[in-house]
Amino acid sequence: MGVAKEGCMQHIPSIAFSSCNYDENADLTPLHDGVLKVVKMVLEKGLPEYTCLNVNFPALPPFKGFKGCRMTHGSWINEVDHRTHPHGYDYYWMVGEYRNDEPETTDTDQWAVNHGYIAITPTKIDVTDYDWLKNFEL
């Protein structure tokens, strides 16, 4: 999502695509048609200013279709592994697992992917909490 957000801030229609298939030899060919449909939609209809899309594919086809949904509330646990490169320098590798804080909720990207749908989540660059701001006093 980082690169998609950077593009979005430069007023470039941006989409991040991810697969839940983490096999380093995964055949991503089955994602081709879904990627093309989303790209075509964005090129034809555009996106609102400062909005980009996060598109997540289930690990394996067949895909049941597309679901527009919100992000799941949760967090990554055990997410970073400290390693040493063969040339001697330290680096950190993203590993971990995702803890879903709302596993019974059916309007989220996690639910959609777990149930065979391609999840499309529109995200905004502006993360200001306007509800909090309305009541701000010091």
Question: Where are the language model's segments positioned?
Answer:
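Internal, conserved structured core segments that host functional sites
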Residues: 1-21
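Structural signature of PLP-dependent enzymes
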Residues: 24-25
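Electrostatically charged, flexible surface regions
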Residues: 28-138
